[in-house]
Amino acid sequence: MDDVGRLWTGIGVCAAVILLMAFLTLCENAAVEFNDAKLKKMAEEDKDPKAIKLAALLKRTGRVVATNLIARSIMIIVVSVGGVIFFYEPISDGLYTLFNYQAPYYVSGICSFVIISCLLALVICTFGIGIPKKLCISGKVGEKFILNNCGVYKVFLAVFSPLAAVSGAVSAGILRLFGIKSTNKADSVTEQ
């Protein structure tokens, strides 16, 4: 594959994964910020099937957030690996030529790796996390979005839930080594 084709393929793969990450971020924020009283009314009184699905999903908010975190972490790894696979050689060769072959080849390799890492971090933070969160906070994306996409969101959560379960089990085991019970106090609300 030539360098131009490799670059376009890399851009396409990374963009697709970042869009999926943005979708998960939008869904998580919209679901967590959904008005509980309104959702309960829609599910129980209005018998809205979308609201019933969402209410069932949000019964375990901690698990949804943990699964979403695992999914986004895996997507960040996929984008990083894809960035190295698709962008490293063309950028490294271009930098080596730019340095007029004066520096050793590994210098251009290190520089290309740093460039790829910084650019991907910027793109992931901006388009995969920052903009979707701000869209939810501003109210542009909210209740209607999560109600319409709850089924698709549940599928993505189901795909990543085995990894979240393994991560939870490992975390619980490590916490037990330190004498800490793995009960989630964030889910229980106490009045003080």
Residue map of PLM features:
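Membrane-embedded alpha-helical segments of inner-membrane proteins
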Residues: M1-E191
